Amino acid sequence: MSRTGSGPAWLTLFRIGNTLTGVIGVFLGAIVALGELPTGKLAVITTLQAISVLCFMASWNALNDIFDLEIDRINRPDRPLPSGSISVSSAKIVTSVMMVTSLICMLLAWFTVDSMGHEFSDWAPSLVIWIIALFLLANYEFPNSLRLKDRGLPGNIAISISVGLVAVFGAAGVLQPYNHRAWSLFLVGVFYNTSREVVKDIEDMEGDEGRNTLAMRVGADSARTTAWVLSLLALAAVIMPFAFEVFPPLHVVFTIPAVISLMLVKSKLLNSEDHEASSLLKKSMTLCLAAFLASSLIG
């Protein structure tokens, strides 16, 4: 196979499933904030910012594989870089191109906002969120940075904040950066994803020798306890927006499938079924976001 890589190899490197989730998150944030699908120029802005997120996340994921090359030779030898499907030099070039494309989309989004007669300050929160995400990326694993990836739980939280901010980014794009429903999505994303990141670190313990993940520092059992506590915080984040009438209280019934899935996580963790626990967390979060979306559209 060519060292420049085939299409499927690049999609694997970019973790296209995760990046598309980011795209959905932007639209979800916009829809939840507006209570309807964005139309006209708001739809253009949302699309541009969704493409920006796609390129940003693809760049982040590729960069993560570049820095994790030696670890992936043990944990994931089938990944594009350790398998040789894509050369490191090609990955670095495309990573840079994707990040530049993300920035260009942001500029185009601002030009669209400006054409609507709005001030820069109306859209500025979108740029602030993009810069925060860039800061987290730069300090996650770059040399001579905070190296959050090697700090255990803080690294998991950094990743999860970037995930949660996607929904707020979508709301900010339609000029509603302080929308309470969008920030409810943020909290759900942070707690669910942090719990899942901890569980994934438990799964990767064999290949993480020498890394300072939470699981490596405190052991698998203590890490599972932490993951469960974070899951309970996720449960609170699911229920509280209905209790405080951010969403109509009666619509809490929409969250029942998400809550049931979340409650099943505990037994998986107790039985050391870490992969199953991770899958349940992902399923529960998806069901929760679907519930929030349904509540917003129904009103």
Please state what every model-predicted region is.
Residues 26-31, 98-107, 131-138, 231-240, ...:
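Hydrophobic core of alpha-helical transmembrane segments in multi-pass integral membrane proteins
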Residues 23-29, 154-171, 215-220, 279-295:
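Small-residue-rich segments of transmembrane alpha-helices in multi-pass membrane proteins
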Residues 33-45, 129, 157-207, 221-238:
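Functional transmembrane core segments of multi-pass inner-membrane proteins
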Residues 70, 136-149, 201, 264-272:
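C-terminal ends of transmembrane helices
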Residues 52-103, 190-238, 242:
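Solvent-exposed interhelical
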Residues 3-12, 81-178:
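Intramembrane alpha-helical segments
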Residues 23-67, 102-107, 123-138, 178-199:
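Membrane-embedded alpha-helical segments that form the functional core of polytopic membrane enzymes
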Residues 2-4, 8, 145, 240-299:
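Extended hydrophobic alpha-helices typical of membrane-associated regions
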